[in-house]
Amino acid sequence: MKKPTHIAALVPYRIYPAKMGGQKGIALFYRYLSELVPVTMITTCNNDSPEGMNANFLPVLSNSKSRYVNPFLFFSLRKIIRQNNCTHLILEHPYYGWLGILLKLFCKIELVIHSHNIEALRFKSTGKWWWKILLGYERFVHRKAGINFFITDEDRDFALKHFSLAPARCHTITYGSELSQAPPIPEKENAAKVLKDIHHIANDEKILLFNGTLDYLPNQQALDVILNELTPALLGNPSLKYKIIICGKGLPDSYDELKAYASKNIIYAGFVNDIDIYFKGADLFINPVIEGGGIKTKVVEALGHGLTVVSTQSGAIGVPPAITGNKLVSVPDGDWQGFANAIATADTASGIPDAFFGHFYWGNIAQKVKRIIS
């Protein structure tokens, strides 16, 4: 007789409180999945207790970097898996692959690798010399897993080709949106009024938004593009009235809170506790990101709020154009004049199609995962 499904999830770093896109992606994945199947989450001891999640939460891992190579974890995790009668082990990222393979062998458990990007390619894009070593390890781990989840179709296609995986074992499980429909127009109009009052923006000025962790190199490079490429191009269009709001923590001190750009329509808001009001109140989200790999979580969040997005082609990976209507404008990487032109002409009035939420709503994503593992 087949045992009832029970998932053990190994999350090797802090995700609670979930503030950044990657943290939200894992936290929301398990919040919605734990509504459908039992989940035991094993994570580091520096996590806060999550709210609104049905999972059995076990913050038992050390915060030390050596935790990734600690052989004694095998015994403690084997005990947890056996005590909870777990049938599946989901590893967030491939780094604990060695441990997952051992647990698969000794606990007779289905091993699932939940990839958030091709890690080796992400490190290659940031200039790490050892990326090929990591690529070989990723390939080895994914080949040992019974089920592989990839964040985009592009990542799945890469893995099928370069890791020689069986297609039936590989599935695209995207980052999602908590919203099952866009916020109503009055709610968006009220949010816009609040933002204009807070940041002293004129009523006839459009609000352009960029959000991201600003000490993360791909986001910092995108900020440099906004300051040095897009701003001169936009200022050269006298018919465009706008302000760009920059949100996010970690801005290096060398940028001096962007004070030198205050006269050039740049507003630095820093880290904001309620990013939703910015997604609701902005007219346009700009995403001039060309590095980093994986799906850009901020693009999904912006579209989920009914916000028009102008993005590089690299920054739009993982978002099918067929389900976004006129809300996602994709510009070739490096064509910054074309990007500025797209900002000036973007359709901000049309709505986001229902098909977007059919694909990206977290509830639907969790149902897909349940069907795969059951």
Summary of predicted features, one role per range:
Residues M1-D48, N84, N237:
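N-terminal subdomain of nucleotide-sugar transferases
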Residues G146, K280-G294, L307:
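Acidic donor-binding loop of glycosyltransferase active sites
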Residues G25-R31, S177-E257, Y268, V272-N273, ...:
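Conserved catalytic-core segment of nucleotide-activated headgroup transferases in glycan assembly
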Residues F75-K79, L105, W129-I151:
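Membrane-proximal helix-turn-helix segments that form the acceptor-binding/catalytic region
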Residues K298-E301, T308-Q313:
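Short hydrophobic beta-strand element within catalytic cores of glycosyltransferases
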Residues T348-S374:
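A charged, aromatic-enriched C-terminal amphipathic alpha-helix characteristic of glycosyltransferases
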